[in-house]
Amino acid sequence: MKAVHFGAGNIGRGFIGKVLSDSNVAVTFADVDAPLVDQLCHDQSYKVKVVGSKCQIDTVTHVTAVNSTSDDVIERIVHTDLVTTAVGPNVLNIIAKTIAKGLTKRFEANNESPLNIIACENMVRGTTHLKNEVYSHLDDSFHARCDELVGFVDSAVDRIVPPSEAANDDLLEVTVESFSEWIVDEKQFKGGVPNIAGMEKTDNLMAFVERKLFTLNTGHCITAYLGALKGHETVRDAIQDPEIRTEVKAAMEESGEVLIRRYGFDKELHAAYIEKILGRFANPYLRDEIDRVARQPIRKLGENDRLIKPLLGTIEYGIENKTLLKGIAAAFKYVNDTDPQAVELQTHLQESGLKATLAHYTGLNENSSEAKKIEAIFTTLN
């Protein structure tokens, strides 16, 4: 089995590429980073440091790479069985054009084999978004063939992969936590679900998408925003602060109650899931910088993202949400001169005040009780 994977960064190599390779899938990475592509082509392997209760180094083999702006990647799409991505939500619309060119050439070559495409991104229904972008670049005459032969499979992915350590001179080595979760919507495949160890299938993907978004993502960013306020440098430092740990756990319990009401998750099992995530944040082998997790606050404050979406759920079900509100207030306190979104957010705050800024970026009514509570909390945070 062959796969083309867009994005040879840490998540691509340390998570999706490794899972595929471990199941004997021949992986071709596609990326714009020329030195990275050249090194992958030369070595055709790389090391992954897997850290949990212990540390082990695995070697991923039988991989290669092409430049994602070249004709090579289009030719690879013609003959591949699977396309996956880990490029970041903002890059999907860029690679969609390349995928559309590859599909066009595939159809022109009369390749009738089914092809499945899976976007492995930190966004809800990311592959559906990618599909819409691909179809916008695909000639109308090919839409019916695409509907018949190409599966656009939504997924939920979860693995903490921090940036590589600066002291490491191995361009390809990547560090990942031992925990990983890759869940796919089995209803969207064409030609059956491939047998890939580490890729779990479900017929109720949204339950798992929101479980991850409302727990891992919500807890992670609140840890970062509260940690930034207290001067912590890493997620581990922040979550070992007893006050922050208590508040992060409470926020995940508030969002967790939404999940329990909405999807019927078992209360005790979900409590154990929260504890597991708190343990992951405290992993001594991971140096996960606060600024990596806190960056792009505007995206994270979107109404369908990790702070506002669970808050809206608490409003829907009449659930306590005071700690989620504090996490949202802390996000508006985040200052980082090297992050354009953080700069934009602080500029808007200075020019328009909190309530107007809150309404502008989150969609919350500035006269709502939640907005008033967030404003009250905001004024108490230093």
UniProtKB/Swiss-Prot annotation:
Recorded GO CC terms: cytosol
Keyword Nucleus in record: no
Keyword terms, alphabetized: NAD, Oxidoreductase
Residues where NAD(+) binds: 3-14
Top-level taxon of the source organism: Bacteria
Matching SUPFAM superfamilies: 6-phosphogluconate dehydrogenase C-terminal domain-like (SSF48179), NAD(P)-binding Rossmann-fold domains (SSF51735)
GO molecular function terms noted in the UniProt entry: mannitol-1-phosphate 5-dehydrogenase activity
GO biological process, one term: mannitol catabolic process
Catalytic activity: D-mannitol 1-phosphate + NAD(+) = beta-D-fructose 6-phosphate + NADH + H(+)
Coiled-coil boundaries: none
Protein EC: 1.1.1.17
Enzyme class: oxidoreductase
Matching HAMAP family: Mannitol_dehydrog
Matches recorded under PANTHER family: ALTRONATE OXIDOREDUCTASE-RELATED, MANNITOL-1-PHOSPHATE 5-DEHYDROGENASE
Descriptive protein name: Mannitol-1-phosphate 5-dehydrogenase
Gene name, Swiss-Prot/TrEMBL: mtlD
